[in-house]
Amino acid sequence: MPTVNQLIRKPRQTKPARNKVPALKGCPQRRGVCTRVYTTTPKKPNSALRKVAKVRLTTGIEAVCYIPGEGHNLQEHSVVLIRGGRVKDLPGVRYHILRGVLDTQGVKDRKQRRSLYGAKRPK
């Protein structure tokens, strides 16, 4: 353990914070092309088939992204916009695909929280 004098001469160094979304390179969103669209199963207490896509970003990085909402039109070579935000029960999924932007259609018949799912206002 250092003495008080040693700490005055050379204070403790703080560890740099770990970046939670490295593929975005400091940007709010990034564009990419789907290389694979598939389903995967969540961690232990939960059970489902979660829709995910592997996306090659404009930065050249491959990221696994979650496709939110019910039903989607994504397939290989679809151009998508991704944002940060992990999915707690899917290990390795740190990004979300934005609905209603580029090749991704919005969720049909969505009444509430429409802006998150790219749904137009119902008539």
Swiss-Prot record:
Q: Which GO terms describe its molecular function?
A: rRNA binding; structural constituent of ribosome; tRNA binding
**Gene Ontology CC, one term:** small ribosomal subunit
Q: What are the UniProt keywords, alphabetically?
A: Methylation, Ribonucleoprotein, Ribosomal protein, RNA-binding, rRNA-binding, tRNA-binding
Q: Where is the PTM 3-methylthioaspartic acid found along the chain?
A: 89
What's a BP term from Gene Ontology annotated to this protein? translation
Domain of life of the organism in this record?
Bacteria
The entry sums up its family as follows:
Belongs to the universal ribosomal protein uS12 family.
Q: How does it assemble?
A: Part of the 30S ribosomal subunit. Contacts proteins S8 and S17. May interact with IF1 in the 30S initiation complex.
This chain's function reads:
With S4 and S5 plays an important role in translational accuracy.
Q: Know the name of this protein?
A: Small ribosomal subunit protein uS12
Query: Which gene underlies this protein?
Result: rpsL
